[in-house]
Amino acid sequence: VQRGYGRILNIGSTGAYMPCPHDAVYAATKAYVLSFSSGLCHELKGTGVTVTCLCPGATQTQFAGKANLLHTRLFKLFVMQPEAVAAVGYEALRRGKQTAVAGLYNKLLVLSAKWLPASVTNPIAQWMVNI
């Protein structure tokens, strides 16, 4: 802030926008990161420092194995490569965007979570984490 310029990149998740069955703490934590980033972005407005929250969906990293998610539809059908996610994050950071959702499928997922009732999105989330 003292320099009048800076960039902050926080890592959220599409799980910030809708429930993650069997992983509620993860979803709640990522919702916090998204909300915190938004608040910080507004607090720093006019200082030259921007805050970006990158919200990827399923990404081909060691996380899926450690979280026991490799067998789920989410990681079988909708996984992105980490390089592609990183490129989205870098571009959003460079442009000073507040949030960035990586991938078309993930963007549609986030839009559906914003516009559809939980009675629709919750079963979708459950379907994605089932085998």
Predicted features along the sequence, with ranges:
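A transmembrane-helix-recognition feature enriched in membrane-embedded lipid enzymes
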Residues: 96-131
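Residue(s) in the substrate-gating loop at a strand-loop-helix junction
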Residues: 13
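Conserved catalytic-site region of short-chain dehydrogenase/reductase
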Residues: 16-18
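Helix-to-beta-strand junctions that scaffold the AdoMet/dcAdoMet cofactor pocket
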Residues: 1-3, 45
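Active-site loop immediately N-terminal to the catalytic Tyr-X3-Lys motif
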Residues: 20-24
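Active-site helix of classical SDR
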Residues: 29
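SDR active-site lid
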Residues: 43-105, 119
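Short-chain dehydrogenase/reductase
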Residues: 33, 37, 86
